[in-house]
Regions:
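Expand to "…catalyze enediolate/carbanion chemistry for C-C bond making/breaking, isomerization
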Residues: 1-185
Length: 185
């Protein structure tokens, strides 16, 4: 992780920034990335700044709890949960966040969740996932991992045809759950 990139992202005039602790960080760099992102979240935040989201490792992954310990700070607006396949995975994180929020004291609002659906099982459960917690504000489609599970080559042209059903199903689930729909994770 490069501190310069974190600083630049947080200084942009955008609605939201997603900092990454998952696939975008090499295993040997995870501890450094956690420290840098944790420190960045602790710095000035509030009106006029982008919302701050962090993509943590997946529920059940050995690194997820260390990720949460590093980023659960007052400057965190939300998490991006990757590779979600069941509503129970959302509920696990919801419970962890509720405990942290209770211990941390009053906040302006609860930590929000954007959910990344990246597998056929997740796609089939998308509506239940999107409605598993009031924290869920967005549903994302991770085409690369989804395609990999289907054995498809990573090819944007093929993706347009082969992923049409999955993308459409995410849109329908997101609209039915009344959450934002984000593509291209």
């Amino acid at each position: 992780h490069r501190q310069r990139m974190i600083d630049k992202a947080l200084g942009l005039n955008v609605d939201a920034v997603m900092l990454d602790l998952e696939d975008g960080v090499a295993p040997s760099e995870k501890d450094t990335a956690r420290r840098q992102i944790g420190a960045a979240l602790a710095e000035a935040h509030g009106p006029g700044r982008p919302a701050r989201y962090v993509r943590v490792n997946a529920v059940g992954h050995e690194r997820m709890h260390a990720d949460l310990a590093a980023v659960l700070r007052p400057g965190l607006d939300g998490l991006v949960l990757p590779k979600v396949e069941t509503p129970e995975q959302v509920k696990i994180v919801d419970d962890l966040l509720a405990r942290w929020e209770q211990e941390a004291g009053p906040r302006r609002e609860a930590v929000r969740l954007n959910i990344a659906v990246e597998s056929p099982r997740g796609l089939l459960n998308a509506l239940q996932i999107a409605t598993a917690s009031r924290r869920v504000i967005g549903l994302m489609f991770g085409a690369e991992d989804f395609g990999r599970e289907l054995g498809l080559p990573v090819n944007r042209e093929a993706e347009a045809r082969e992923m049409l059903y999955a993308r459409s199903a995410i849109v329908i689930a997101g609209v039915a759950a009344r959450v934002q729909i984000i593509d291209g994770v």
